[in-house]
Amino acid sequence: MLPRLFLLVLLGFSSAALLRGAAPLTSPKQHFGFAIGDDYQLATYTQTEAYFKKLAAESDRARLVDIGRTEEGRTQWMMIFSAPENLAKLDRYREIARRLARAEDLTDDQARALAAEGKAVVWIDGGLHASETVGTHQLIETVWQLASASDPEMLRILRDTIVLCVHANPDGQELVSNWYMREPEPTKRVLTTTPRLYQKYIGHDNNRDFYMSAMKETTNLNRQLYLEWFPQVVYNHHQSGPAGTVMFVPPFRDPFNHVYDPLVIVGVETFGNAIQSRFLREGKPGATSRSGANYSTWWNGGLRTTTYFHNMIGLLTEVIGNPTPMRIPFIARRQLPANDLTSPVPPQEWRFRQSIDYSLAANRAVLDQASRYREVLLYNIYLMGRNSIRRGSDDHWTTRPARLDQISRLAAADRTGSENNEDSPEPGEGPPSGGARLPQKYWDLLRQPDWRDPRGYIIPADQPDFPTAVKFINTLVKTGVAIHRATADFSVGAKRYPAGSYVVKTAQAFRPHVLDQFEPQDHPNDFRYEGGPPNRPYDVAGWTLAFQMGIAFDRVLAAFEGPFERLPYGQLQTPPPGRLPNARAPVAGFLLSPRANDSFILVNRLLKQGAEVFRVTTPLPAAPAFGPGAIYVPDRGQARDLVRTSARQLGLDVVTVPAAPAVENLLRLAPTRIALWDRFGGSMPSGWTRWLLEQFEFPFEVVYPARIDAGKLRDRFDAIILVGGALSAPGVRPPPTPRPRNLPPEFEGWVGRLTPEHSVPALREFLHAGGTVVTIGSSTGLASHLGLPLQSALTERNAEGRLRTLPDDKFYIPGSILSVRVDPTQPVAWGLPERLDVYFDRSAVFARPSNLPGFQPIAWFETETPLRSGWAWGQKHLKNGISLASIPVGAGRLHLFGSEVAFRGQTHGTFKLLFNSLQLATAKPAAAR
């Protein structure tokens, strides 16, 4: 009795401490002038930032942490909430979370002791997709609740957990809220398309950047997730819920990825069930899961999904809601209770505050679950990390669909003509399920040595584009992966590697993420029913980053050691300084490799300075490995200093030559006047391309449809880039053109779209006048608009003999990586290898024309099995199809890049296609001067 009484007294003192505040707390209504969730009201980031600062100053439960700058220069904030006594030991609890997540040098007993001492760390974010306004505003209300609520449940949550409340997109909130609130009459306010993307470059794709970490905001968030705090639970708020429901809640539909720990999926289901259970207790109907939407746990790259590959429980909800009142529609199939929709919601008018309340209830459910199972969460993240380390330290096999299919086909072939029925059940067993029953020998085949998971990967320092390999290493560094670097030359097996090579071992906690970035994804064949249409993957099916970036690496299947130094976690790498010989003999000029992407940065700097720069059309004896297209810079004036300083900075090795190459083999470069298409509301492919051009220091101008339609483009531009979505193919209905009411005058010139009637004649005129047009993805349809006799390779004749596009049940390749054969003698392909990985997302593929003079195939599908990573149903239809091509049109040139050569800033392996096409747009034979 006495110990229990003593405990109650202690709890009472603790609760009293939580109830005390240093000063009265400012409510959202007092600060913003309206309650969060009021109709027709949105808060700006400027107001939200001020509120965070005010609340942090007033509450002893809160800390405010600056986590970095956004792309537009704003401060990105994270608020940390816990009991005051926990905040006093915040560094200790963060250290416990870090040690358990990395699972290094810990015994199980030590991990249990740390789990008993630690606090569950829960991440709740808001605002990543700024037009999804519930997310930002539930975050504001959540920080208020965490700072002010004094009910027993909240006090327990604060004692047991550390809550990270993270603003995911400050720039977007400022843009969207100001755009909505610009209408002075509240009842006329409507959430419409903003003039530009709600993240400076990539808009909605800010949730597609989390393994690449290209954007500043992504890097800020990843640092907190994988280098600082290691939360066991990450809750990512989104909109909008499926029509006829209120909210999509975990668990998710299949497939889930084969490389991560099953405890991840069990944890996701546990928390999803906790949310749904709370909704039912509180009388909140309308939550759906699994088949209620197409969200899955297959893909890496989103804020929520990348956590799975780091042994964290990633939660996503998608809720309806709008500051302008809306209505839940009547959808008959959403009114019948089912496993994935246990409590349908009636059609009704719906208010913003109702969505806020659902989000708050979901947050409470997650925090309550984390509080109740604090030790389990902490120990489980250790257990998953320990499992990863053990799997990477021993022989381990990941079961993949393609291997199972291969074994099944082998077994079927073995059974042909055999009277032995392997499928007959044993006595006492039911009928076979899940496929044929196979003998043990086929299981043993699945464990053949060559199918083992790698123990590690070696990225050689002597590969043609090592600076890009370093960029790849930095994507791993930013996501918390342990990296080693060789301090001396070493050998593994029969191969020799130079000092400076990087080594990534799989015996580490984040092994799933390591495997995912090096190994091909093997997406299962996923159809609604046998012979039916495919189930579209959530986002993409294959993305192996090492393939996309064109990195040379070796898989090592057995244990290996060497002179390796382990780099500090989070330490970004730079390439070794480029080498430039100190030639004693006279030097005529310098050669740069066309195989290194960063050579284009140096070329752009030289052109900006007015230096002479040439491309060499044939291989040179001084640098035979460069192949055709080497960059030649005469040793003159300031060019010498710029080559020396930039080459060292960029890690570019320079070759000196005593004599200039023959003038007939030189193309003189000049600055290219580049136009990049965009539209009102912003195009994500255009935004990514804008970011890419800035990174590689290309000068360019963004142009809108009205400027293209105005014609006389050759007077101002040398090259025009039309990314995917700029121009619809003939016969394809274009998307509607947004035109908000009360459009400010400065945006009038942004409205409109490219059309066959007005835009194509202007582009034809530009081409005939000597301009270059680079088309990517769907915009390659310009060739048909121009009347060029090009046909798709992905067609068949129907019963009536008419040509039609192959249906999805015969050919379907969502986002995946395919291999093509390249002709590196083509100028646009200079610097590329003969085999290239390209990103393919239902992309254009051309049949070889028989009557198109000057048509130049650049890359084509050479085999019936080009799949490298992802899902390719009916890939045999690609054989001999052309992926990349170039055509002369008048005095100009049209480049057709059916595959996505600049996809999301990730496809470094194909950037040269874009860069060459731009720099060569103004190239002239040097002899013609």
Region roles according to the model:
Residues 22-161, 202-203, 208-209, 214-216, ...:
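Intrinsic-disorder/low-complexity accessory segments
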Residues 171-172, 241-243, 323, 728:
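Feature marks short, surface-exposed loop/turn motifs that line or immediately flank catalytic pockets
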Residues 1-2:
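N-terminal secretory signal peptides that target proteins for export/translocation
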Residues 5-17:
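Bacterial N-terminal signal peptides
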Residues 165-170, 180, 236-244, 779:
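Short, solvent-exposed turn/loop segments enriched in Gly/Ser/Thr/Pro and often Arg
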Residues 153, 161-166, 170-208:
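Divalent-metal coordination cores built from histidine and acidic residues
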